[in-house]
């Protein structure tokens, strides 16, 4: 199927081994003139002898099916759904040969399940000398089978002595069902014949043509095979060919994450041991009580489009209702806010048009979708690079325990757990890890409340937990969320929420970043600095936002980012190890001198320690989750194609392209207004500059 043997080495080895077993199965077996099976091992066999087995495996598919068809036509044997490996002229049946690195009976069942045919005989060999065959009929004599088993054992030892066996053994997948021949009849058959490309008379013709398509031939040849209409001139791709991506103009882009990142401020309690510890509302009230600088709130940066007094009233309402809770005998576990005018407005209550069943309105003559405006273009702003840099930094707390990146299911090999521990040590204090835990907490709490209290405006504290340098537990409060009505039937149905988050960042410094927020000043905080205590205004960033079941589900699984970046690091270690022919995990993490490429900036290729690489990869993965969007999906997929072409140029592979303009268009239509996509595009331009030097 056009796999590259240099890349898919295990698959290549499996294909070769299987082919060799098929050949050995057939070797020396003949049928004499009395139609008896005989074994002839010496030189030139008698001309009257006929080979007992027809070898089907190893031919190209068109030829193989031709052989199968002709056997079926001459013998009347039922035509198999999948290409078998051999045909036995003595027993008049097809044979499926299996060679497995797993248990023979498991593999046998998979094979039997796949081919679902009583007629085809199955014979499985393993590398450990076990075998299994249909109805325990092993067809061949002991000696022939022993030859095959010995050969397999030799291959295994040869592989093991070169350190290749473990990888080969583990790489075996279950049966793949590529070969199935669906018999298409009736209407479907007529439709299939009608929908063929021009110049094909029947489905069979077309299939034979597709099967004969050489996957690795030259592109021009392929194109000329396709159609007279395609005239793609292959243009050589040279250092001077590519141009930088065009980033959009317009006002600077604004913050669109579901919660504040570098600008967040926490109210914290250490060693929490209060009554009801671990109940979010109790924890939140305890955190609020640690701060004494509250003052009469006022608006310092209004939201352009919103009714700003409502945001102010919403915050005052939160303070008042928290006060009410404290006056009660017993603090409740959850708090539902009164449905005031300001909250109804902020949560879009009764704003959504009523949903009507399509049946009831399909006769409306001018039925149409809402007119929606094109998104407004935005330019790249410097704040998003600062956000990314911050996410790569170390904090003074640890946000995950050692076992946060799940245990392995299999008995864990020493190397894997060693890598995981090294990696965890590098990222446990990283700010991106704080964002993961914050995201998991918020999404879990919001999804929970959305299901448990559908009609209520529930108050949800934004909380995280960590450990200080001294190992003391700490509970942090970032602010609050108030959830709107949440009758979420479909994955994409939206629940609105208002977020209110503490911060020390003055919004007037980068007003464009805070376009979607109304910012209040709500207190003064005393901070210890080198010059003693200073008082700083404390701000509250308020905005309405929304999310859906599917987004919350992904948000709850943000820990996967740890796994993704760990796997990227592992592949770097694997590359090093295969060059040095020994496991390089320890050296990789403990070498203090070596620097690694981290990314591109206008200054050139940035380098850093291995820890910095881990944290940068993690931050990228986390930002892909925090700033997930269709623009990012499109940009990642399309820009990757340009990246591969540029890399091919760097590897002196003389790449050629057609319709490069179309590729640029596909990439640039994703560059609209998303801060993370714009930043990635500007990084991509830096990469282009340096790669084409």
Swiss-Prot record:
Organism: Influenza A virus (strain A/Chicken/Hong Kong/37.4/2002 H5N1 genotype X2)
Position of sequence motif Nuclear localization signal 1 (NLS1): 101-116
Residue ranges annotated as motif Nuclear localization signal 2 (NLS2): 161-224
Places the protein is found: Host cytoplasm; Host nucleus
Binding-site residues, Mn(2+) 1: 18, 85, 96-97
EC number: 3.1.-.-
Function of the protein: Plays an essential role in viral RNA transcription and replication by forming the heterotrimeric polymerase complex together with PB1 and PB2 subunits. The complex transcribes viral mRNAs by using a unique mechanism called cap-snatching. It consists in the hijacking and cleavage of host capped pre-mRNAs. These short capped RNAs are then used as primers for viral mRNAs. The PB2 subunit is responsible for the binding of the 5' cap of cellular pre-mRNAs which are subsequently cleaved after 10-13 nucleotides by the PA subunit that carries the endonuclease activity.
Cofactor(s) the protein requires to work: Mn(2+)
GO terms under cellular component: host cell cytoplasm; host cell nucleus
Top-rank lineage group of the source organism: Viruses
Key words, A-Z: Cap snatching, Endonuclease, Eukaryotic host gene expression shutoff by virus, Eukaryotic host transcription shutoff by virus, Host cytoplasm, Host gene expression shutoff by virus, Host nucleus, Host-virus interaction, Hydrolase, Inhibition of host RNA polymerase II by virus, Manganese, Metal-binding, Nuclease, Phosphoprotein
Stored InterPro entries: INFV_PA, PA/PA-X, PA/PA-X_sf
Subunit structure: Influenza RNA polymerase is composed of three subunits: PB1, PB2 and PA. Interacts (via C-terminus) with PB1 (via N-terminus).
Similarity comment: Belongs to the influenza viruses PA family.
GO molecular function annotations of the record: endonuclease activity; metal ion binding; RNA binding
Endoplasmic reticulum recorded as keyword: no
Post-translational modification: Phosphorylated on serines and threonines by host kinases, including human casein kinase II.
Protein residues bound to Mn(2+) 2: 57, 85
Cofactor remark: Binds 2 manganese ions per subunit.
GO biological process: cap snatching; symbiont-mediated suppression of host gene expression; symbiont-mediated suppression of host mRNA transcription via inhibition of RNA polymerase II activity; viral RNA genome replication; viral translational frameshifting
Gene3D superfamilies: Influenza RNA-dependent RNA polymerase subunit PA, endonuclease domain
Name of the featured protein: Polymerase acidic protein
């Amino acid at each position: 199927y056009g796999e590259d043997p240099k890349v898919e080495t295990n698959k290549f080895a499996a294909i070769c081994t299987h082919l060799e077993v098929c050949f050995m199965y057939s070797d020396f077996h003949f049928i004499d003139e009395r139609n008896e099976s005989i074994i002839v091992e010496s030189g030139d066999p008698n001309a009257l002898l006929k080979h007992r087995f027809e070898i089907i495996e190893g031919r190209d598919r068109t030829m193989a099916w031709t052989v199968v068809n002709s056997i079926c036509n001459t013998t009347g044997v039922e035509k198999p759904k999948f290409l078998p490996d051999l045909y036995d002229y003595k027993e008049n049946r097809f044979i499926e040969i299996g060679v497995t690195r797993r248990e023979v009976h498991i593999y046998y069942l998979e094979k039997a399940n796949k081919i679902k045919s009583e007629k085809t005989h199955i014979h499985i060999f393993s590398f450990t000398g076990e075998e299994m065959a249909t109805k325990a009929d092993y067809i061949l004599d002991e000696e022939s089978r022993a030859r095959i088993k010995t050969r397999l054992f030799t291959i295994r030892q040869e592989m093991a002595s070169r350190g290749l066996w473990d990888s080969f053994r583990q790489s075996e997948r279950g049966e793949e069902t590529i070969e199935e021949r669906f018999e298409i009849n009736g209407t479907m058959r007529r439709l299939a014949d009608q929908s063929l490309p021009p110049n094909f008379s029947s489905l069979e013709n077309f299939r034979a043509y597709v099967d004969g398509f050489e996957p690795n031939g030259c592109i021009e040849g392929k194109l000329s095979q396709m159609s007279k209409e395609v005239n793609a001139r292959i243009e050589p791709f040279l250092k001077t060919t590519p141009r930088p991506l065009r980033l959009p103009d317009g006002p600077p882009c604004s913050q669109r994450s579901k919660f504040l990142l570098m600008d967040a401020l926490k109210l914290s309690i250490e060693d929490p041991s209060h009554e009801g510890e671990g109940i979010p509302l109790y924890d939140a009230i305890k955190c609020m009580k640690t701060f004494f600088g509250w003052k009469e709130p006022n608006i310092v940066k209004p939201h352009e489009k919103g009714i700003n007094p409502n945001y102010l009233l919403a915050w005052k309402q939160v303070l008042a209702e928290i006060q009410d809770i404290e006056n009660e005998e017993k603090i409740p576990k959850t708090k539902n806010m009164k449905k005031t005018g300001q909250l109804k407005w902020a949560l879009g209550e009764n704003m959504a048009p009523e949903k009507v069943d399509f049946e009831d309105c399909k006769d409306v003559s001018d039925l149409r979708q809402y007119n929606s405006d094109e998104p407004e273009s935005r330019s790249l702003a410097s704040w998003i690079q600062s956000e990314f840099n911050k996410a790569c930094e170390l904090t003074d707390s640890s946000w995950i325990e050692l076992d946060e990146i799940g245990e392995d299911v299999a008995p864990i090999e020493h190397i894997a757990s060693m890598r995981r521990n090294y990696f965890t040590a590098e990222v446990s204090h990283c700010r991106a890890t704080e964002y993961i835990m914050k995201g998991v907490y918020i999404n879990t709490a919001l999804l929970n409340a959305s299901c448990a209290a559908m009609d209520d405006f529930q108050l949800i504290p934004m909380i995280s937990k960590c450990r200080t340098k001294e190992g003391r537990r700490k509970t942090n409060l970032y602010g609050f969320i108030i959830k709107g009505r949440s009758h979420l039937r479909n994955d994409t149905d939206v629940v609105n929420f208002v977020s209110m988050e503490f911060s020390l960042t003055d919004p007037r410094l980068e007003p464009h970043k805070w376009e979607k927020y109304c910012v209040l000043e709500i207190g003064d905080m005393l901070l210890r600095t080198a010059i003693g205590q200073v008082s700083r205004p404390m701000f509250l960033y308020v905005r309405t936002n929304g999310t859906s079941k599917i987004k919350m589900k992904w948000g709850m699984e943000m820990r996967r980012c740890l796994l993704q970046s760990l796997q990227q690091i592992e592949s770097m270690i694997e590359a090093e190890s295969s060059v040095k022919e020994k496991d390089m995990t320890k050296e990789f993490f403990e070498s203090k001198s070596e620097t690694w490429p981290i990314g591109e900036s206008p200054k050139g290729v940035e380098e850093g320690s291995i820890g910095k690489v881990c944290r940068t990869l993690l931050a990228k993965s986390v930002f892909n989750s925090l700033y997930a969007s269709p623009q990012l999906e499109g940009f990642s997929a399309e820009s990757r194609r340009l990246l591969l072409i540029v890399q091919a140029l760097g590897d002196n592979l003389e790449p050629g392209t057609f319709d490069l303009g179309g590729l640029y268009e596909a990439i640039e239509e994703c560059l609209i207004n998303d801060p993370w996509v714009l930043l990635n595009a500007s990084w991509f331009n830096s990469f282009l500059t340096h790669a084409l030097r």
